[in-house]
Amino acid sequence: SIPAPAQLYCELICRSDKLIAATDAVYPDRAELAKDVSKVYRELILDLYKHGARDIKLDDCTWGVLVNDSFWHAFDEGHLKREEILQLYKEINENALVDLPEDLRITTHICRGNYDSTWASEGGYGPAAPYVFKEKGVEAFYLEFDDDRSGDFAPLAEVPADKVVVLGLVTSKKPELEDPEALKARIKEAGQYHPLATTALSTQCGFASTEEGNHLTDEE
């Protein structure tokens, strides 16, 4: 699991005024920055493959923020509309995945924050669905759906039938277990929008994505 190319690009142009200034000093042309991020990531992925990696997951927080109406503009470059940013991030990711080995599996996880049993972003996948779910080179999408802040399943209709949707219905933020029948019902509901034959179940995220971890004991 590695940060997605679009995630790195976003960090370089959004994280802080100091970092933005340092980035602009080297890359006054953002298009060149995007191009080089994709190029370096492709080289990294091929090197990981050379050393034995056959399944690489791109951890991407950008989409979760861009669907959050309360602060998506924090990722704005000052002159682009949300749709233009979504298209840009899609292209950055796709350009890193060109002409990869056929036996290398690329997946992506849309992370919405997972630390101290809390989260960072909310909002349905709808605004990003026509972009992220159409990314070329990605075989599976790990999606958080453990509570209402992720919206409904309707955006899954944008995922091609041959791509795998991994439903993150099991929370990793608290110890209480989900009701099996409730999980079955939600999976059936998701099946209205994406074939169950290419649908899987998982936790919504990891159990300790940062050093703070979540409010869980080892036993839990």
Over which residues does each language-model region extend?
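Domain-level signal for soluble alpha/beta catalytic cores
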Residues: 1-220
